[in-house]
A protein has these predicted regions:
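Short cysteine/histidine-rich zinc-coordinating motifs and their immediately flanking basic loops
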Residues: 53-61, 97-104, 110-114, 138-143
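Short Cys/His-centered divalent metal-binding micro-motifs
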Residues: 77-110
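Cys/His/Pro-rich metal-binding microdomains
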Residues: 44, 88, 99, 125-128
Length: 147
């Protein structure tokens, strides 16, 4: 029977899922405390103390990583190399900016400022140089150019 209603239908292209799930490693309470103290509870983008719940952010976006990093096995220097602290709002801003970059391979200017301390606006296999990747390093490098 035909109902006369027009509807959009999606065609299943494959029985196997295309999305490959990457397991995330949970951060223990002790490791979280260690990381928060290491970064002095300061937001990487502003340097200000975080009064709300700080979020431990992977510098390299989750969508670009092959596998998660087990932070419980890292030295303090390695933790600083792979992670930064952000407020929830800043983490959401970063997530959106990195999502646009992932789609277009064009780096979104950090907080509207078109400055990259390594590379330029074109993503070339690394996030290094982008303010969204490392807010502290980005501010330090920009300050050198201003002085």
């Amino acid at each position: 029977p035909i109902c006369g209603t027009r509807r959009t239908h999606y065609k299943l292209l494959s029985e196997e899922p295309v999305f490959v799930e990457k397991p995330r490693i949970s951060i223990t309470g002790a490791t979280r405390k260690k990381i928060l103290e290491l970064f002095d509870f300061r937001d990487a983008f502003t340097g200000a103390s975080i009064s709300s719940t700080p979020e431990i952010d992977h510098k390299e976006p989750w969508t670009r990583m092959e596998q998660d990093i087990d932070d419980s096995l890292l030295s303090p220097e390695e933790i600083k190399e792979h992670f930064q602290l952000l407020t929830r709002e800043h983490n959401l801003l970063k997530d959106r900016a990195c999502g646009k970059c992932k789609e277009s391979n064009i780096r979104t200017p950090f907080l509207g400022i078109p400055f990259w301390y390594e590379g330029d606006s074109t993503y070339c296999g690394t996030c290094r140089g982008c303010g969204w990747y490392d807010g502290v390093k980005w501010r330090e490098e920009l300050s050198k150019h201003i002085k």
